Amino acid sequence: LGGRKGGMPEMVFEYVLAQKGIDKKDVNINQSIDFGSTAAAFSGGQGDYTIEFEPSATLLEQKGDGYVVASVGTESGYVPYTSYSVKQSYLKMHGATVEKFTKALQKGMDFVQTHTPEEIAEVIAPQFAETELETITAIVRRYYEQDTWKENLIFEEESFDLLQEILEQAGELEKKAPYKTLVTTKYAEEAAAKG
């Protein structure tokens, strides 16, 4: 179960398959189920494998419905799943806000780099009130051991190129965009330097 065509989980999965020498035509990737519903479909008996974000992956394990056998993220390289985008006009008018926001995010990155999975889980637990602390800790530990979190927020050109390569390979990008035109690392670099 890959989620819908054009969704990042499915596109990154196809990219990893290609990197491992597996032609996507040799596997049956079900793209008929919305990504938010794949865990339930898998629990219900659909598919031999599923691609899941957390907490779905850990919950499948805890229910005995599946096992995490590999991390697509570990195999793909640093894919910039989350980024902050603003128009140039906003950046010009509200640069101080972007700077404060970036510094706050960097503080979170610094915290993750200097604390144990147990400490991180305790701090973030109130944001996940419906999830038990033990589950949150298991998820954080998995991400921690996989080196999921970078040390800083700098959106490197290599990651930008990787993202575009994934989109292009999936048939979702007709023309690559120039990194220097679309990305500024000024605020992230300043926040990392002050960290």
Task: State where each predicted segment sits.
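Residue-level detector of short coil/turn "hinge" positions at structural boundaries
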Residues: 24, 67, 174-175
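Residue-level detector of family-conserved "landmark" positions at structurally sensitive sites
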Residues: 27, 70-71, 135, 154, ...
